[in-house]
Design a protein with these regions (language model features):
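Membrane-proximal basic amphipathic "stem/tether" segments
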Residues: 1-46
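C-terminal domain-boundary segment and adjacent tail
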Residues: 42-55, 82-83, 95-96, 214-241
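Divalent metal-coordination and catalytic microenvironments
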Residues: 65, 79, 88, 112, ...
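Alpha-helical scaffold elements lining the catalytic groove of polysaccharide deacetylases
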Residues: 120-147, 155-202, 214-221
């Protein structure tokens, strides 16, 4: 069995509107089944209650999905200027094509974790196929100094079977609690407004994406708003340590 860890139980996601919406019944069932099958596995669910699993009061984690991309180095430059470290959930086939961008992320002091090898929904795979997705990506990432590796399913799509497969392979499934909405935003100001209309609470895991120039533009104000609330910026791994 995995090492003893808390189990996140949130059933709602906080998004750009600042409202909450129930998770689909399938996701709710997955949570209940996984909770009974693997009560010691840590799963951070989309929703404000994800902060229940944070052991570091006052900290907020920035996470970036879908990299590495041609914009990765620009993200890293801005984060360095802001003196902020973040967690990058990377796509395996992109890592294989551009290992130099992965190295740059690590050399910048950031945390890297898996986001699937092909960016297909984990719920579409058999257990054997998902295991291959996890391990192929993991082999391309520097070893993490922790008992369990982090993984974020593409699109946040989970099922009882996928959660079980990830856990048995030694992966902690990490979703998010505050969605920046940058992937659908029309401009940087729209991303920035998310953080004024939905103020981040301690322990929040913020979802952002690579490949979005408007996200790069919004980052200084996003980070500034989080610091103005008294939060320290950390990696997801540090938040859950």
């Amino acid at each position: 069995m995995p090492a003893s860890l808390s189990f996140g139980t949130a059933l709602h996601e906080r998004g750009p509107s600042g409202t909450s919406s129930p998770l689909a019944s399938g996701r709710r069932t997955a949570k209940l089944l996984a909770e009974r099958l693997l009560p010691e596995a840590l799963v951070v669910w989309r929703g404000s209650e994800a902060r229940r699993v944070s052991r570091q009061p006052g900290r907020v984690a920035l996470s970036f999905d879908d990299g590495p991309t041609p914009l990765t180095l620009r993200y890293l430059d801005v984060l360095e200027q802001l003196r902020v470290r973040a967690t990058f959930f990377l796509v395996g086939e992109l890592c294989a094509a551009h290992p130099e961008w992965v190295r740059a992320i690590v050399e910048g002091g950031h945390e890297v974790a898996g986001h699937g090898y092909t960016h297909r929904r984990f719920t579409t795979f058999s257990r054997a196929e998902l295991t291959s997705e996890l391990l192929r990506t993991s082999e391309l990432l520097p070893a993490r100094d922790a008992k369990r590796q982090l993984v974020r399913p593409p699109y946040g799509a989970v099922s009882a079977s996928s959660l079980l497969t990830c856990a048995l392979q030694g992966f902690t499934t990490v979703l998010w609690s505050l969605n920046s909405g940058d992937w659908r935003a029309r401009d940087a100001q729209e991303v920035e407004r998310t953080f004024s209309t939905t103020p981040a609470s301690a322990g929040e895991i913020v979802l952002l994406h690579e490949g979005q120039p408007l996200t790069i533009e919004a980052l200084p104000r996003v980070v500034g708003s989080l610091k103005d609330l008294g939060h320290e910026l950390a990696t997801v791994g540090e938040l859950l340590a």
